[in-house]
């Protein structure tokens, strides 16, 4: 069995300066979390493990802090501010490397998060006899040449390939090509720039895993279809307090005491929703030490939790709430509570179950000293049919 030849030394450029708006993430997609860590970190770790040194990352203006956080702990990484176009960003990174020029450089799109080591190896070895090497895959679908909304001609897919990154180059060749580029529009990729400069490009086998993360659906596909969280809360009953429970006010001789309106039912639901998406608990988001939440309506807390669920790529599946008390009687108010909770979560009342029980006169709830509530919540990936 032949022993693979060692990889030659190389530098790498990771292009991460785009806005990434189509991905529908709260931050540019290269900094969004995917499979447990920022998209950018995936490919940088792969390049670093393969021996890339240094790695120059082109980032948006004023994104230094978020980029540094995304790559915390990874050594030999240099940041440069990207330009208006991808080509401008690559040029800036190449110029940064030019002071100590490497012999070979790989240029990779950060949005291609999964970067298999065999692809890196094939691209680098493809430079043994060419000024450039790019990973490609065959075209599997039939193709048509369009003229407006009509088919004008067929296209021969046998001679076409899908192009991926990382694209590898002899550094001096690609730097000279970028400096000489006079195209009227931005180049489609760096191989196009080198070809315009008379360079030779080798084609090597790509990998389907190098899919580019582009749309919101690409991020959702990585999410679990359903996640579950639970919550529990207790508040003391005191005279002179209003009793808010399940988002509605009840008439009773005592009310629940707390920093906010002390609605244990909504608090339990908030904790269940936050737990389902791994966002801590109600105290993390609304600390009782913060005076702005003094006497606050718990409806604000549950709406905040629902917003975080949405931002995480999920929608509320269902809520199962149990209120534990001797008094007041919950039965007459269950439907109103369910309706109000559904309104706050922008979901159907059918998705909300409100139940009540007692502890048979045992414990603090049995003695009428307080009310407890527990909740279970499911959140469902937003692209799942309702």
UniProtKB/Swiss-Prot annotation:
InterPro entries: IspD (IPR001228), IspD/F (IPR026596), IspD/TarI (IPR034683), ISPD_synthase_CS (IPR018294), MECDP_synthase (IPR003526), MECDP_synthase_CS (IPR020555), MECDP_synthase_sf (IPR036571), Nucleotide-diphossugar_trans (IPR029044)
Positions of disulphide bridges: none
Cited PROSITE patterns: ISPD, ISPF
A UniProt-annotated Pfam family: YgbB
Site (Transition state stabilizer): 22, 29, 259, 358
Keyword Electron transport in annotation: no
Binding site for 4-CDP-2-C-methyl-D-erythritol 2-phosphate: 233-235, 259-260, 281-283, 357-360, 364, 367
GO molecular function term, any single one: 2-C-methyl-D-erythritol 4-phosphate cytidylyltransferase activity
SUPFAM superfamilies attached to this UniProt entry: IpsF-like (SSF69765), Nucleotide-diphospho-sugar transferases (SSF53448)
Annotated segments matching region 2-C-methyl-D-erythritol 2,4-cyclodiphosphate synthase: 227-386
Positions annotated to bind a divalent metal cation: 233, 235, 267
NCBIfam families per the UniProt record, alphabetical: ispD (TIGR00453), ispF (TIGR00151), PRK09382.1 (NF006899)
HAMAP family xrefs: IspDF, IspF
Family: In the N-terminal section; belongs to the IspD/TarI cytidylyltransferase family. IspD subfamily.
Protein name: Bifunctional enzyme IspD/IspF
């Amino acid at each position: 069995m032949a022993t693979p030849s060692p990889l030659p030394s190389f530098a790498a450029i990771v292009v991460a300066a785009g806005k990434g708006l189509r991905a529908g993430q709260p931050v540019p997609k290269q900094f969004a979390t995917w499979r447990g860590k920022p998209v950018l970190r995936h490919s940088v770790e792969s390049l670093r493990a393969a021996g890339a040194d240094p790695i120059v990352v082109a980032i948006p203006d004023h994104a230094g802090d978020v980029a540094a956080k995304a790559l915390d702990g990874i050594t030999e990484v240099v940041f440069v501010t990207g330009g208006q176009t991808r080509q401008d960003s690559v040029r800036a990174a190449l110029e940064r490397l030019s002071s100590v020029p490497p012999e070979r450089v790989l240029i990779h799109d950060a949005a291609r998060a999964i970067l298999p080591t065999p692809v890196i190896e094939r691209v680098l070895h493809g430079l043994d006899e060419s000024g450039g090497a790019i990973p490609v895959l065959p075209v599997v679908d039939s193709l048509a040449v369009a003229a407006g909304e009509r088919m004008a001609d067929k296209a021969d897919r046998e001679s076409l390939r899908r192009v991926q990154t990382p694209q590898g180059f002899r550094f001096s060749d690609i730097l000279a090509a970028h400096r000489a580029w006079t195209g009227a529009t931005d180049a489609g990729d760096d191989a196009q720039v080198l070809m315009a400069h008379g360079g030779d490009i080798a084609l090597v086998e790509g990998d389907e895993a190098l899919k580019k993360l582009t749309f919101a659906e690409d991020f959702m596909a990585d999410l679990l279809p359903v996640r579950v969280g639970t919550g529990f809360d207790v508040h003391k009953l005191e005279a002179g307090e209003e009793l808010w429970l399940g988002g509605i006010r009840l008439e009773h001789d005592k009310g629940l005491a707390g920093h906010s309106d002390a609605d244990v039912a909504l608090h339990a639901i908030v904790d269940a929703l936050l737990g389902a998406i791994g966002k801590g608990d109600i105290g993390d988001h609304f600390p009782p030490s913060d005076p702005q939440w003094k006497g606050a309506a718990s409806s604000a807390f549950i709406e905040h939790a629902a917003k975080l669920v949405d931002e995480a790529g999920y929608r509320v599946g269902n809520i199962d709430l149990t209120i534990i008390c001797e008094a007041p009687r919950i039965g007459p108010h269950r439907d109103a509570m369910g309706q109000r909770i559904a309104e706050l979560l922008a979901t159907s009342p059918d998705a909300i179950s409100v139940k009540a029980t007692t502890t048979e006169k045992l414990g603090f709830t049995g003695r009428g000293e307080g009310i407890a509530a527990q909740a279970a919540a499911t959140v469902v990936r937003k692209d799942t049919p309702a």
